[in-house]
Amino acid sequence: MEQVVVIIGSTSDAQKVEPAIQILQEFNVEVGVYCISAHRAPDGLKHFVKKINDSGHTLVIIAAAGKSAALPGVIASGTIVPVIGLPLGGTPLSGKEALYSMTEMPPGVPVATVGIDAAKNAGLLAIRIIATQVSDLALGLERYYENLAKKSLEVNEQIHMQYAENRSSDHFQKV
């Protein structure tokens, strides 16, 4: 089994989890992607979660689902491996029903949940969890966030300069 297992409930969800897979691969985290529906194949999902438990290798599970979004909760009920719920949009309620389903879990069945369609954040949260045990990964995350801050400050400077130049033009002068 891989360090991070991404489980989707439908093939239509595959493209939506790509940002999570990409960031995990960028950090050289072993990732596997599986499609097992909590509604259509509950016994198959139970068997797969048991396989994850028996392997002892998987450190985080990302479960992506839309609509009623039972997938993360069903997975979390069968494992002590941290489960990150990734609510997916593209539904009549724009993913809110999936978000509510994942955040309103009963006591004893925790699911960490990221924002609707926030696959990259799901991947980054998985990396953060693993980085508590893997120092090389922690160092990589530090560099990642330093670079993110640097880019943000560069954008700030560009925006500031753009509007500073415009302030001196007639466009911003009082009438």
Predicted features, each with a name:
Residues M1-R40:
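Glycine-rich phosphate/diphosphate-binding loop of Rossmann-like nucleotide-binding domains
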Residues E2, N28-V31, D54-T58, V81, ...:
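Glycine/charged-rich beta-loop-alpha catalytic/anionic-binding loops adjacent to active sites
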Residues D13-E18, P42-L45, A65-V74, L93-K96, ...:
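Short glycine/serine/threonine-rich phosphate/pyrophosphate-binding segments
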Residues F48-P87:
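Glycine-rich phosphate-binding loop
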Residues L93-L139:
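Short, glycine-/small-residue-rich phosphate/pyrophosphate-handling segment
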Residues I130-V175:
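Glycine-rich phosphate/pyrophosphate-binding loop and the adjoining helix
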Residues V33-D54:
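N-terminal beta-loop-helix "entrance" segment that forms/cooperates
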